[in-house]
Amino acid sequence: MSNSTPLPSSFDGDTDFYEENRWQKLTRRLKEEPLIPLGCILTSLALVGASRSIRAGDHNRTQRMFRARIYAQGFTLLAMVAGSMYWDSDRKKRKEFEGVLAETKAKEKNEAWIRELEARDEEEKEMRRARDERRRRAEGRPAPKAVVTDAPAEEGEKPKGGVMEQMSGLVWGKK
């Protein structure tokens, strides 16, 4: 093969498997639902305030901080529920898009695999022809005048596209 680009291999890693990295996903989620991190921060601040008041021995402040923690957690839960209701249709569309994207990538990978198999088959045929030619030369026999390897069954019939199509014809009895 004179092509300088290597053939795609079925053993290659799928480099486009992840569309967005973790940092991009985190920033997207923070932009979509900014109230959830706010609720988490408020809960953490209430817990820090409660632990400081426990160390100081202020029971009234400790009780207020624990109540603030409960309110902050309730706020966080409400933000989560409201955000999930608001972004539900967007998530469904995103999942549908990712499904279509995965399907097209699987088709492309399958087509690349078939092209690779066909190219390997052609290379094997070339190697077989060269080996037969060397064998004939070594034995001193002349080469046959007309060697047809991929001739159609009838003159009016055109050869099919590739190995997989020919094999499917054999399997399903359409030869």
Swiss-Prot record:
Listed InterPro entries: Hypoxia_induced_domain, RCF1
Pfam assignment, any one: HIG_1_N
Matches recorded under Gene3D superfamilies: 6.10.140.1320
GO terms (BP aspect): mitochondrial respirasome assembly
UniProt-listed PROSITE patterns: HIG1
GO CC annotations, alphabetized: mitochondrial membrane
Subcellular location: Mitochondrion membrane
Transmembrane stretches, start-end: 35-57, 70-87
Cited function: Cytochrome c oxidase subunit which plays a role in assembly of respiratory supercomplexes.
Biased composition (Basic and acidic residues): 125-142
Region (Disordered): 118-175
Domain (HIG1) ranges: 7-98
Subunit structure: Associates with the respiratory chain complex III/complex IV supercomplex.
Highest taxon of the lineage: Eukaryota
Membrane topology: Multi-pass membrane protein
Family according to the record: Belongs to the RCF1 family.
PANTHER family named in the record: HIG1 DOMAIN FAMILY MEMBER 1A, HYPOXIA-INDUCBILE GENE 1 HIG1 -RELATED
UniProt name for this protein: Respiratory supercomplex factor 1, mitochondrial
Keywords carried by this UniProt record: Coiled coil, Membrane, Mitochondrion, Transmembrane, Transmembrane helix
Chain segments annotated as coiled-coil in the UniProt record: 106-139
